[in-house]
């Protein structure tokens, strides 16, 4: 175990915070509950942005930007929306030395101000669909905060679309859910469950919410992304109508969806270890770090550095994201640890013997420190590609194996009861697949007694037969298979 990072088993929360700080991802700001995202942390967010932005544009979305200041009256137009968010509002009542005629809310989410603009922009069926994405910051006055996972201010993207039909809006909602799922699994190497939220857990103002749920190493769930079908709620609140092909005026159907810097928290908690951050290659800002092993003689060191420059050039020409650590003041061990803290997937060591043999020594961040071997310069590009691809797959498989191991099925039977369910959730956590009757009362009691919530009605188990199945709490006829878990 590193002398600088707490043990996961002894203090999971401190382990997480140690990695955030030691990997220089973020620091605490003077404002309570806010964080400063440091350059390395922001570079991860930039990678997330660039990949998702491309995917949004491929699916017909355009970027725009809407004001951070929202008139309070806008939020009052959708009752469920304001009821859900009002405890988290940050409100400005004075500006320029005077009291404002109307309070302004710092953006908690942008449905209201965007739909106010849509009422001006949408008049005809020719204006639809309207598919806009925004990269922005959000302010929600959280009581209990933790860097990346839950902060007063955070960065996110939010998509807002308008459609002529319910079918189109639902299709959009599920399309984006799939975009998120593929991104999180293919790039972040995090296996996820997708499914519909219960009425209790859905987004304030939505008809239905679909979420993506991942399991962290402490066996708590984390909601990684959401996609909402809004129906006509916001169109009616802001009187957004269009003239259809028959000349009739109709309200517009809507969706909204988003992910945030919380994904960085998920990366940390799914993959990292007691040596520091572990980043999947496809999302790592730096895929490869080249570390020269210096000697005392300047002439030898010049040969090593010249050789390292050739290695870096070859890798950059092949399209890899690579850097070299030329810090002559620090020992190789210190520089190895620094690369481990930052989670850089591949480390290439170059000593004078490597120069003489026309080779480099390669190691992988997700492997034991004893895992290293020499490769020739001729095979450098192909070998590095193989190891990066293997690491991406191995990280996903390791996380999937962990989730499988910590997903338990507990149903009412002669062997198992609600007490079995409750004892398991309280003692072991993880995901529990069980049955639910759809009653809010049962959902509330389970949450109060176990702190576990219904994470989603998972798509993975839709095909399973509910015949004869009963609610884990009340034993009434079951309507759904659901995933329970304690969560962030």
Curated annotation (Swiss-Prot):
The lineage of its organism: Bacteria, Pseudomonadati, Spirochaetota, Spirochaetia, Spirochaetales. The gene is proS. This is Proline--tRNA ligase. GO terms for cellular component: aminoacyl-tRNA synthetase multienzyme complex; cytoplasm. Homodimer. Belongs to the class-II aminoacyl-tRNA synthetase family. ProS type 3 subfamily. Transmembrane segments: none annotated. It is found in: Cytoplasm. Its EC number is 6.1.1.15. SUPFAM superfamilies: C-terminal domain of ProRS, Class II aaRS ABD-related, Class II aaRS and biotin synthetases. One of its GO terms (biological process) is prolyl-tRNA aminoacylation. Pfam families: HGTP_anticodon (PF03129), ProRS-C_1 (PF09180), tRNA-synt_2b (PF00587). Keywords: Aminoacyl-tRNA synthetase, ATP-binding, Cytoplasm, Ligase, Nucleotide-binding, Protein biosynthesis. It catalyses: tRNA(Pro) + L-proline + ATP = L-prolyl-tRNA(Pro) + AMP + diphosphate. One of its GO terms (molecular function) is proline-tRNA ligase activity. Consists of three domains: the N-terminal catalytic domain, the anticodon-binding domain and the C-terminal extension. NCBIfam families: proS_fam_I.
């Amino acid at each position: 175990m590193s002398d600088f990072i707490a043990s996961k088993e002894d203090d999971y929360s401190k382990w997480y915070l140690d990695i955030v700080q030691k990997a220089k991802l973020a620091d605490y700001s003077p404002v309570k509950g806010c964080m400063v995202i440091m350059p390395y942390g922001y570079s991860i967010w930039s990678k997330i942005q660039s990949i998702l932005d491309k995917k949004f544009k491929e699916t017909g979305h355009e970027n725009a930007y809407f004001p951070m200041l929202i008139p309070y009256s806008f939020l009052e137009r959708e009752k469920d929306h304001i009821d859900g968010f009002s405890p988290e509002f940050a409100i400005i009542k004075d500006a320029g030395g005077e009291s404002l005629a109307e309070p302004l809310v710092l953006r908690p989410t942008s449905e209201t101000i965007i739909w106010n603009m849509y009422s001006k922009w949408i008049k005809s069926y020719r204006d639809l669909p309207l598919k806009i994405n925004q990269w922005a910051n959000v302010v929600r006055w959280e009581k209990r905060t933790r860097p990346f996972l839950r902060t007063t201010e955070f960065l996110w993207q939010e998509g807002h679309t308008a459609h002529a039909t319910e079918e189109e809006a639902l299709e959009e909602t599920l399309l984006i859910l799939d975009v998120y799922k593929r991104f999180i699994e293919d790039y972040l190497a995090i296996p996820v469950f997708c499914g519909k939220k219960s009425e209790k857990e859905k987004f304030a103002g939505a008809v239905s919410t679909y979420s993506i749920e991942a399991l962290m190493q402490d066996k708590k769930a984390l909601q990684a992304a959401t996609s909402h079908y809004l129906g006509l709620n916001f169109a009616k609140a802001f009187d957004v109508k269009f003239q259809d092909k028959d000349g009739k005026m109709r309200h517009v159907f809507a969706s909204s969806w988003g992910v945030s810097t919380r994904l960085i928290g998920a990366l940390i908690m799914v993959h990292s270890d007691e040596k520091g951050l572990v980043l999947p290659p496809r999302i790592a800002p730096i895929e490869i770090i080249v570390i020269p092993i210096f000697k005392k003689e300047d002439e030898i060191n010049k040969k090593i550095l010249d050789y390292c420059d050739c290695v870096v050039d070859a890798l950059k020409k092949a399209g890899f994201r690579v850097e070299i650590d030329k810090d002559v003041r620090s020992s190789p061990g210190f520089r190895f640890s620094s690369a481990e803290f930052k989670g850089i997937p591949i480390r290439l060591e170059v000593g004078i013997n490597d120069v003489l043999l026309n080779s480099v020594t390669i190691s992988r961040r997700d492997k034991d420190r004893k895992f290293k071997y020499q490769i020739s310069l001729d095979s450098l590009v192909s070998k590095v590609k193989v190891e990066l691809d293997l690491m991406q797959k191995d990280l996903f498989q390791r996380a999937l194996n962990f989730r499988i191991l910590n997903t338990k099925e507990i149903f009412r039977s002669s062997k198992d009861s609600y007490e079995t369910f409750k004892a398991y959730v309280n003692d072991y956590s993880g995901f529990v697949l069980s049955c639910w009757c759809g009653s809010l009362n049962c959902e509330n009691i389970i949450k109060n007694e176990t702190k576990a919530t219904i994470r989603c009605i998972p798509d993975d188990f839709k095909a399973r037969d509910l015949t004869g199945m009963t609610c884990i709490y009340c034993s009434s006829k079951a309507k759904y298979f659901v995933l329970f878990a304690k969560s962030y």
